[in-house]
């Protein structure tokens, strides 16, 4: 079996095979279910993670996540969950974002800090950010490491993913599709608009609140493509 695990909402799903459960793994595996919390050991350290899926290895898709050399140490206890909640309490996260943003401003980097997460083992802080392009943030890592006295992991989040998690109302007047039901975020090109005879509407009407081409362009294109296949 493959256990799909997420440490934070921003992280991609990490798939861990059942044989990567520590001592007593068979007993743990038989009791794990979606929604449970576990202690996960990776090359970065130890984190509290949530089981978001349980599937057979044959159903694994590299598009939804990645297999990692990680070990599920055990099912999390109430004390483990309380500890993680304490480490990542809103007040502490808000302060971490504020301090990180201050260093970003001092270094004049074109990036926006959107979230932070403290690892369960206390040795690492993950800083989540958005940016229009790739950035050399080596000086920022040094500054943050000195400030927090911990290892720093910087994680760039796509603009679409931000709106997927935070939600908003689309130009159509309905909640964003990415927030409600879309789970696969393939690249959307202007070709999708051309093939649906929508290119003449102009980029302003084809762009979503995230500033990218609307996901529904690709969704509708794929939907029509599947309908044509069924008719044939």
For each feature predicted by the language model, list its residue ranges.
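Acidic-enriched and Gly/Ser
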Residues: 1-193, 198-200
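Iron-sulfur (Fe-S) cluster-binding segments and ferredoxin-like electron-carrier domains
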Residues: 177-196, 202-207, 213-231
């Amino acid at each position: 079996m493959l256990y799909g695990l997420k440490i934070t909402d921003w992280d991609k799903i990490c798939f861990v095979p059942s044989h990567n459960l520590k001592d007593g793994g068979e007993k743990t595996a038989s009791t794990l279910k979606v929604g449970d919390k576990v202690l996960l050991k990776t090359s970065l350290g130890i984190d509290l993670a949530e089981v978001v899926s349980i599937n057979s290895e044959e159903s694994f898709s590299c598009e939804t996540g990645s297999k990692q050399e990680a070990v599920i140490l055990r099912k999390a206890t109430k004390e483990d969950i309380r500890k993680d909640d304490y480490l990542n309490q809103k007040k502490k996260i808000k302060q971490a974002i504020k301090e990180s943003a201050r260093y970003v401003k001092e270094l004049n980097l074109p990036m926006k800090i959107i979230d932070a997460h403290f690892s369960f083992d206390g040795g690492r802080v993950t800083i989540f950010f958005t940016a229009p392009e790739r950035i050399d943030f080596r000086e920022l890592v040094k500054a943050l490491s000195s400030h927090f006295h911990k290892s720093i992991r910087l994680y760039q989040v796509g603009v679409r993913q931000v709106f997927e998690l935070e939600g908003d109302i689309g130009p159509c007047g309905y909640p964003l599709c990415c927030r409600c039901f879309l789970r696969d975020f393939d690249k959307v090109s202007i070709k999708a608009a051309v093939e649906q005879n929508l290119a003449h509407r102009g980029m302003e009407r084809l762009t979503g609140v995230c500033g990218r081409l609307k996901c529904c362009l690709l969704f509708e294109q794929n939907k029509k493509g599947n309908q044509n296949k069924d008719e044939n």
